[in-house]
Amino acid sequence: MSRLRKLFLMDEHTCPWWFVYTFDNPIRRLVQNPCAILRGLVKEGQTVVDVGCGAGYFSLALAELVGADGKVMGLDVQQRMLDIARRRAKRRGLDRSIEFRMCEPDSLGIEEPVDFVLAFWMVHEVSDRKAFLDEIKTFLRPSGLFLLVEPKVHVPLHRFEKTVELARLSGFEVEPGPKVWFSRSVVCSASASAVGQQP
């Protein structure tokens, strides 16, 4: 029961690399189409970051959306996840558009300004959510957007609302995000007008 609780319920943990195959498969595209979720938030030519990129499900879509003039950084704490993501990017011909990097559990290591940050189904794995949100605020451009998506099964409403409140305390303006199957989402921006500036 303890192992099942760690995987399916609310304990803080890092999703093991092998578990990605249970939900990162062709059927997922039917209910969580990455381009449909991200379109309207990401522009061609932007620099974007996929935090907790796992096997690259969203990183590949981000690379297609930002195009040849854009840049994608996929971050994860597990080397095996990054290895899978690199192989997938190479098969799709996107390996030159995406830089996959190992990051530390308490530091993302981004030193350049970025236009968009995605944290999909991973903030609940972070031990210090406030420090994590503070760090994102340091490298997100004033006009940039941060899409935060959490799974309903791991993150009950009260805990998601606490994360949203922490985002506000970190200086973000928060608005409802796109509808994502089995998830709750918000779009965070450094300024109140940033969401309206996007196409």
Predicted regions and their residues:
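Class I SAM-dependent methyltransferase Rossmann-like catalytic core
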Residues: 13-30
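Conserved alpha-helix/loop element of class I SAM-dependent methyltransferases that forms part
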Residues: 28-46
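A short acidic, Gly/Pro-enriched loop at the edge of an enzyme's catalytic core
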Residues: 103-117
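A short glycine-rich, Lys/Arg-flanked "PGG" loop and its adjoining helix->strand segment in the class I
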Residues: 130-142
